[in-house]
A protein has these predicted regions:
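Secreted/extracellular ectodomain signature
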Residues: 1-127
């Protein structure tokens, strides 16, 4: 469920399949809609570190900013909370695996994340 009690997915399989994650349901912890494409500032890049099926990348491919310990090395896989991107393709519409972070500091710093539309936000799921 999201912060307002709307069901996002009934289980992990549905979460990584036909889920209910949209800009209107992928709310902040305060129950507010997260800024996306067309909003200022765009904050739709969400830190996930996940492949589209929800599994981790192989250990030789860092997609978690050195297991969430570095702001200068590695990159993080990002999803789009509004399910929109610069292209009309599957990756751009993915909530959990759209593109890696990037930027002048390497992709993981507070300075890097806004360059592609992020703010260091993450999803929180519980059952």
């Amino acid at each position: 469920m999201n912060a307002k009690g709307v069901i996002i997915a009934k289980d992990v399989a549905e979460l990584h399949g036909a889920n209910n994650l949209t800009k209107q349901t992928a709310l902040t912890e305060k129950g507010e809609v997260n800024n996306g494409i067309g909003d200022k500032p765009n904050r739709h890049d969400i830190l996930t570190g996940s492949q589209p099926d929800g599994t981790a990348f192989s250990p030789d491919k860092d997609m978690t900013c050195k297991n969430w310990t570095s702001s200068t090395e590695g990159a993080a896989m990002l999803g789009h909370s509004d399910r929109l991107g610069l292209r009309d393709d599957e990756a751009s519409h993915s909530w959990n695996s759209s593109h890696p972070s990037r930027g002048p500091d390497g992709g993981c710093s507070e300075t890097d994340l806004p360059t592609t539309g992020g703010a260091g936000l993450l999803y929180c799921f519980a059952n």
